[in-house]
């Protein structure tokens, strides 16, 4: 394979991994432990 193809596949995989982890953190079971700064400062 060419170097550009391998680099493109690596960058695509890295981007998909970061996106998947972000969605899991935002909406998965971990999200129950996240704090909401807007609810802490209601007036």
From Swiss-Prot:
The chain crosses the membrane at residues 4-24. The keyword Thylakoid applies. GO terms for biological process: photosynthesis. Keywords: Chloroplast, Membrane, Plastid, Thylakoid, Transmembrane, Transmembrane helix. It is a single-pass membrane protein. Its main location: plastid. Pfam families: PsbN (PF02468). It is found in: Plastid, Chloroplast thylakoid membrane. GO terms for cellular component: chloroplast thylakoid membrane. Signal peptide: none annotated. The keyword Flavoprotein does not apply. It comes from the Eukaryota. May play a role in photosystem I and II biogenesis. Belongs to the PsbN family. This is Protein PsbN. It comes from Emiliania huxleyi.
């Amino acid at each position: 394979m060419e170097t550009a193809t391998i680099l493109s596949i690596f960058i695509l995989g890295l981007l998909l991994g970061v996106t998947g982890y972000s969605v899991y953190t935002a909406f998965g079971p971990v999200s129950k432990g996240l704090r909401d700064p807007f609810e802490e400062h209601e007036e």
